[in-house]
Amino acid sequence: MEVTGLSAPTVNVFISSSLNSFRSQKRYSRSLTVAEFKCKLQLVVGSPASCMELELYGPDDKFCCKLDQDDALLGSYPVDDGCRIHVIDHSGARLGEYEDISKVEKYEISQEAYEQRQDSIRSFLKRNKLGRFNEEERAQQEAENSQRLIEEEAQASTIPVGSRCEVRTPGQPPRRGTVMYVGLTDFKPGYWIGIRYDEPLGKNDGSVNGKRYFECQAKYGAFVKPSVVTVGDFPEEDYGLDEM
């Protein structure tokens, strides 16, 4: 069978399994590798990714081909809307075993024994260099995070504490206030700007998760990224919140 790439970025398919009697309809990106696709299917059918064999059936439910190349893209197979992907489980589990979790016996294994197993999720991820085992992807992610931090630090350095500012975030009207905090935080990575708004348009009182970064009334404080803050001559506006 000829295998061709399809242009639509996502596809709606039905998922069935040799372990259960129901079908699920899901949407997936064609840019996933088969190995990555198997990892996502774990949450749908319950089978370990390393124990899956995938079969593709057309919208007419006739067998098309096997998805047997872990490094191939899902979109390189003739997968189209309405197709069915059937998961054959080779873990030794029985039909219906994963349908009622109350019947699943708790299984414990030592870390050392788990590391030696070749059919484990961790072994599958290592073998296919997915997730945290993809050194190149992880290094690229770390480089992007470092570059983002450098850019945020440069932006934050132009925003002095005590200055008047205007905050513009997508989907919200401009809000004015005073810069009360500039720097790193414990609640999320990167540089953040603590704002005391002129009106109760914020989310906190200058503290997050029990740690205080600045003082203000409840609902007057907020933390935003430097990129949405403009410092300048922004006098207080009358929002009409005191009118009866």
UniProtKB/Swiss-Prot annotation:
Keywords for the protein's UniProt record, in alphabetical order: Acetylation, Chaperone, Cytoplasm, Cytoskeleton, Developmental protein, Differentiation, Microtubule, Neurogenesis, Phosphoprotein, Ubl conjugation
Modified-residue entries (N-acetylmethionine), positions: M1
Modified-residue entries (Phosphotyrosine), positions: Y98
Domain CAP-Gly: 183-225
A GO term from the CC aspect: microtubule plus-end
Subunit-structure text: Supercomplex made of cofactors A to E. Cofactors A and D function by capturing and stabilizing tubulin in a quasi-native conformation. Cofactor E binds to the cofactor D-tubulin complex; interaction with cofactor C then causes the release of tubulin polypeptides that are committed to the native state. Cofactors B and E can form a heterodimer which binds to alpha-tubulin and enhances their ability to dissociate tubulin heterodimers. Interacts with GAN. Interacts with DCTN1.
Family of this protein: Belongs to the TBCB family.
UniProt name for this protein: Tubulin-folding cofactor B
